[in-house]
Swiss-Prot record:
Protein name per UniProt: Alcohol dehydrogenase
Primary gene name: Adh
Effect of R185K: In strain: Persimi44
Record GO biological process: acetaldehyde metabolic process; acetyl-CoA biosynthetic process from ethanol; alcohol catabolic process; behavioral response to ethanol; NADH metabolic process
CDD domains, per the entry: ADH_SDR_c_like
Cellular component GO terms held in the UniProt record: cytosol
Sequence similarity: Belongs to the short-chain dehydrogenases/reductases (SDR) family.
EC number(s) on file: 1.1.1.1
EC top class named in words: oxidoreductase
Length: 254
């Protein structure tokens, strides 16, 4: 899929991986990049505009933990501005297993709620045009970093939820896939808390292993968006992009 003249909404598009991905996206000659983030970063917005002045870049403050009704209200404003949205990227995430409720609220519940809100505009059963959802998971959603089980569990939930969305595409008209970064050198992983402090040095130990840069991750992130494969589970690790084949151990039969 060509991203030329597309309208993209990027939740957490100013974070570590998010900002580098936004830089790559504007190089693709989007029509609009709408960034929703908790913290404003005018310098980053100015930089993105300078990379490609032809792309209209808009920022709205957004906390993914707000009720669905508030997200729906914000999306109504965005749709009024850009008329159509082609791609939604759900990228908000925290890594701190001391904050159990907030980890689940940001990494999973917020993603589900943002998705639920945009379905109000996209669902073909309501006359919507459909759309594409790219959810950011993590390789920990495949195999946990066992010292951070809350974070890992939240990312496993993202993979499962997104796979369900993909299978619902014939009903809703909305396709979905996950991009799942491996350990990427961002502020997220420089220092974080393990669950119940089971491993005080978990961040240091993790960074002793091979990692990738956020730029490497961002380049493959955008490649995955361009490939636009419904139901795909992409692994973005060590500068590579690889589709994951999920092993089915049970079938609901419905």
């Amino acid at each position: 899929m060509s991203l030329t003249n597309k309208n993209v909404v990027f939740v957490a598009g100013l974070g570590g991986i998010g900002l580098d991905t936004s830089r790559e996206l504007v190089k693709r000659n989007l029509k609009n990049l709408v960034i929703l983030d908790r913290i404003d970063n005018p310098a980053a917005i100015a930089e993105l505009k300078a990379i490609n002045p032809k792309v209209t870049i808009t920022f709205y403050p957004y906390d993914v933990t707000v009720p669905v009704a508030e997200t729906t209200k914000l999306l109504k404003t965005i749709f009024a501005q850009v008329k159509t949205i082609d791609v939604l990227i759900n990228g908000a995430g925290i890594l701190d297993d001391h904050q159990i409720e907030r980890t689940i609220a940001v990494n999973y519940t917020g993603l589900v709620n943002t998705t639920t809100a945009i379905l109000d505009f996209w669902d073909k059963r309501k006359g919507g045009p459909g759309g594409i959802i790219c959810n950011i998971g993590s390789v920990t959603g495949f195999n946990a970093i066992y010292q951070v089980p809350v974070y890992s569990g939240s990312k496993a939930a993202v993979v499962n939820f997104t796979s369900s969305l993909a299978k619902l595409a014939p009903i809703t008209g909305v396709t979905a896939y996950t991009v799942n970064p491996g350990i990427t050198r961002t502020t997220l992983v420089h220092k974080f808390n393990s669950w119940l402090d089971v491993e005080p040095r978990v961040a240091e130990k993790l960074l002793e292993h091979p990692t990738q840069t956020s730029q490497q991750c961002a380049e493959n992130f955008v490649k995955a968006i361009e490939l636009n494969k419904n139901g795909a589970i992409w692994k973005l690790d060590l500068g590579t992009l690889e589709p994951i084949t999920w092993t089915q151990h049970w079938d609901s039969g419905i």
